[in-house]
Amino acid sequence: MDISDFGTVLPIGIEKFANDFDNVDILAGFDNDELIISNFEKIEIEPNNISKVKDADIFTLLINGKVKDNLLINEVTNNENNYVISREQENIAFGDLKENKNLILYGDLSNGKTITAKIIAYKLLREGYEVFLLNDFYLKDSVFNEVDEILKKFEKTIFIIENYTANMDVVAHINISRNLNTKMLLTSRTFEHEKYIDDILFNKKQLDVNETFEEAVDKISENDIEKFINYLDRYGLWSEKSSFNLMQKKNYIKNKANSEIHGILLGILESPAVKSKIDLLFKEMVGSETILRNILAILCLNISNINKVTHHLVSAMTNDSSIFSSSFREKSIFYQLVNENTDGLFPKSSILSEYILENFLNPEVLVNNLIVLCKNIHSKSFSRNDMYMQIYKDLASFRYAQRILPKRNKRESLINFYEGLREIDQERKNPHFWLQYAIARLSFSDKDNLSSENLIYVRHHLETALSLARSIPNYWTDDIDTQYARYYVELAKTYSLSDVDLAFNDFIKAYELIIKIHKGGRYKKEIVRPITFFDKFYQKFSEVFEEDQKIKLELCCKNILKIITNYPTDVRVIKANKILSEIIKDINFKNHIINNV
């Protein structure tokens, strides 16, 4: 290429060039009012957008989680349900954001929070709001200035912050700088939201609790179930369940899919045609330990909410450099499971990632390899708060561990997982590790009663956690006390009816711990978790309680009910409220029968 390729070259000389350069207006061509942003994406609706939904679009949306914005805009504009389903939560959330300053949408993987957020954004665009989405990767040095410029330029503004708990510095700045008509639409996975929301609203008060509305999107409402049935009918996605009648399909969504989009998607993956392809992937994965660990690293990092999975990060987890080889990444299993671009490595489907992990053919092989990956990433950490330690903490937490381990023999796999992590020297001195280990042993008690032997281990782990915690200045032990309360409820359930006094004493210990935690003054909804197991204890011993025990039990339930009545509503609070109310009602009913015989 030569300079003449760009046009005619005129010899003007150096002096002429210098004079012309001095006279150039560097502001020419720029609109001083133009907003230049790099940390946010301005969401806009293209005019005359007409696109028809194809079957391939539906499959790509459901299995790969890839949203076509033009089709989504059509849905909002035309009020249709061809591409996505207009859900009850969406309408409730939209109304609440119009009335309040902040809306938080939270839900687990593949349950529709991103689509719901986009639909709400498009609706508000049509009502005159300017909508800005925070990019996954932004410059902290300039993002605050961009927020200020946006707020100066536009009166009605909505900021969408995905994974908001990891971006609280930006959220806090918007909250402090906001105008009268500034709104925030925040999204998060359920685990992160529940972990931090109490601190954000009640302890640090980074958002106004009276102006912040929380909407869980995990569950499909009763009114929307039939919409989902019609949607699956229209696109022939029922597979071998196509012959089900309406009631059978409703029961499938409610029970098998747990009234969740996530459950419906897993059901689609279980169809014979898709399942046979996945079985081939399993065989290729277990055929090579190197392939298995690299694939597992990418899948686990995706599920643990890492936005940018780089080759270096995968290499750090596997302690292997194979991922840098293009020939290694060109293997068929990578092509089928992983997308690669300049930002890093991404599973083609989050729901497929979870399905592969949940249904792994050999749980022991998976657990052993996950332990190796966790040990590797832990060994790379040089600070309590560096990226490697944050990844390790995520993967080693009970909430994530139960999602990345096979559903077959889940509790046994969890226990084996924490037994493996116990070999890390630092973890044996960490109270939080022993707490997670205890939670693993307490897990899934609703499916079967925990054995007395298992509960002995639970007590040992909790005693270790509490002892280590007390040696650390200002260590907050409420989480340990919460699991102690849960332990006492589970222990009470193991006694025979003839040992009702021992069972009742353990119940009182659980009650006293719950009251102690509440009096500590740090608001946390986790306090209600042990309460959700009271019903099984009551059902077992209700016919053998002494009169004074019934009186005390009723008083305990009333005291706790009074406490949690002031808690913001969520699924666990509602469940605890219902259980306590039913116990009180049953005690009063039985007393009424006795007194009127």
Regions of interest found by a model, annotated:
Residues 122-132:
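Post-Walker A helix-loop "phosphate-sensing" segment adjacent to the P-loop in P-loop NTPases
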Residues 99-117:
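Walker A/P-loop nucleotide-binding motif
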Residues 1-72, 230, 558, 565, ...:
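Acidic metal-coordinating catalytic centers involved in nucleic-acid phosphodiester chemistry
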Residues 33-89, 109, 263-325:
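Winged-helix-like regulatory helical subdomains adjacent to P-loop NTPase cores
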Residues 191, 200-247:
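Conserved small helical "lid"/interfacial subdomain of P-loop NTPases
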Residues 370-374, 409-424, 451-470, 498-518, ...:
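Alpha-helical repeat scaffolds
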Residues 133-142, 146-178, 183, 187-190:
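Conserved P-loop NTPase "ATPase switch" module shared by AAA+ and STAND
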Residues 304-482:
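C-terminal leucine-rich, beta-strand-based interaction scaffolds used for sensing/assembly
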